[in-house]
């Protein structure tokens, strides 16, 4: 039984060849030089932007709701959020394909690319930069932040003083 299984497996493996034998380095070079497909065949031209773009107003609103100050580089934040939205839409698009195929599956805007040039690293922060940012922080009453001093936190400020009623 094992011999039959081995011989049939060997026949399956050795009998089906997709490519011809490449014996010389010239044959290998010429084989690899031939282009059999193009990535442009996989991509369709944009059929209209069905995905929502993250606008600078949305970024400012999200920063305010999260309690962060407006950033100077909100274009980079907008770009990063758009990339994240592309990834999320791509993930949900693939999830929905199991139930019903999506119309925008091959839309150029919906393809998430992870390229090093798209995600350039920012300058690292050092201790001096962090201390400078901390010293420049001011409480923002619109966020519910209240300014106080250390004397406001002393133990005496939490003691209830009882006074006698004088008639």
From Swiss-Prot:
It comes from the Eukaryota. The keyword Membrane applies. Residues 1-19 form a transit peptide. The keyword Phosphoprotein does not apply. It is a peripheral membrane protein. One of its GO terms (biological process) is mitochondrial translation. GO terms for molecular function: ATP binding; glutaminyl-tRNA synthase (glutamine-hydrolyzing) activity. It catalyses: L-glutamyl-tRNA(Gln) + L-glutamine + ATP + H2O = L-glutaminyl-tRNA(Gln) + L-glutamate + ADP + phosphate + H(+). GO terms for cellular component: glutamyl-tRNA(Gln) amidotransferase complex; mitochondrial inner membrane. Its EC number is 6.3.5.-. Keywords: ATP-binding, Ligase, Membrane, Mitochondrion, Mitochondrion inner membrane, Nucleotide-binding, Protein biosynthesis, Transit peptide. Belongs to the GatF family. Allows the formation of correctly charged Gln-tRNA(Gln) through the transamidation of misacylated Glu-tRNA(Gln) in the mitochondria. The reaction takes place in the presence of glutamine and ATP through an activated gamma-phospho-Glu-tRNA(Gln). Required for proper protein synthesis within the mitochondrion. HAMAP family: GatF (MF_03151). Subunit of the heterotrimeric GatFAB amidotransferase (AdT) complex, composed of A, B and F subunits. This is Glutamyl-tRNA(Gln) amidotransferase subunit F, mitochondrial. The gene is GTF1.
